[in-house]
């Protein structure tokens, strides 16, 4: 029954242009933005549905999966995607107080190998994409050591065919597990993250673009593999639109960024 952080930013993206033209939409935009900012957890990150619910007492209850079904802590994916919205659509930058808190939270939660764990997608590719695109949108330097470490990690995970693919076992083991094949959505996430960081196309980016271009008509198991997260080790989602939406977004960002730079 609760409103959703991710759906709210999606709605606000859709309302942005119209909000500049009429008062009613402008009012809806402001209410949505105010609510979004009010939902920032005290630790600086954003949850999915509920604010400040990450109590160690709840996660210690003798209920299977209590840590994932009974709490809604800040996550790298929600925090990164909220930052990406605030930076690209709401004019927020690195020196704004909510952004400063969120950036500090993200940098403190980066894994040793350079990745971030994503709660609502599979898993380290998803979290790293969200974190990097969010950091770039609010003005963090591409040369920042944490950014470069994440880029190195992403590049190392690229498959021989130019794509990326991660197993759902990552979500359960809390450790990156290669799928052994590439998926459209995970390739798009990794590619979009690299595009956000690099001012010009790199060999890894070009190989990723080639993979997405070749796989647009594919219809094998990789296009239906679940890349949405539910309950680690128990529930995963294969969103049918993911194979189209995320590649289209990554390809459009590639076109808009590098075509204008050439």
Q: What feature does the model see in each segment?
A:
Residues 1-262:
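Preference for long, amphipathic alpha-helical scaffolds in soluble/luminal domains
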């Amino acid at each position: 029954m609760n409103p959703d952080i991710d759906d709210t930013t999606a709605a606000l993206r859709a309302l942005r242009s119209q909000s500049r033209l009429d008062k009613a939409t402008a009012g809806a935009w402001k209410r949505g933005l105010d609510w979004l900012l009010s939902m920032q957890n005290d630790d600086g990150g954003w949850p999915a549905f509920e604010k400040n619910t990450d109590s160690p007492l709840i996660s210690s209850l003798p209920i299977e999966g209590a840590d994932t079904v009974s709490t809604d802590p800040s996550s790298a994916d929600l925090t990164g995607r909220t930052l990406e919205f605030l930076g690209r659509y709401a004019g927020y930058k690195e020196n704004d107080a909510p952004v400063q808190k969120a950036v500090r939270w993200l940098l403190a939660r980066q894994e040793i190998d350079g990745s971030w764990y994503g709660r609502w997608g599979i898993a380290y590719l998803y979290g790293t994409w969200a974190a990097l695109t969010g950091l770039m949108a609010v003005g963090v330097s591409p040369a920042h050591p944490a950014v470069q470490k994440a880029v190195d990690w992403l590049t190392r995970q690229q498959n021989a065919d130019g794509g990326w693919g991660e197993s759902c076992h990552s979500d359960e083991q809390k450790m990156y597990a290669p799928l052994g094949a590439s998926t459209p959505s995970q390739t798009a996430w990794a590619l979009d993250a690299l595009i956000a960081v690099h001012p010009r196309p790199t060999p890894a980016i070009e190989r990723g673009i080639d993979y997405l271009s070749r796989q647009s008509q594919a219809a094998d198991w990789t296009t239906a593999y679940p890349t949405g997260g539910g309950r680690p080790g128990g529930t995963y989602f294969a969103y049918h639109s993911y194979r189209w939406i995320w590649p289209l977004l990554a390809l459009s960002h590639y076109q808009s960024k590098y075509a204008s730079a050439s």
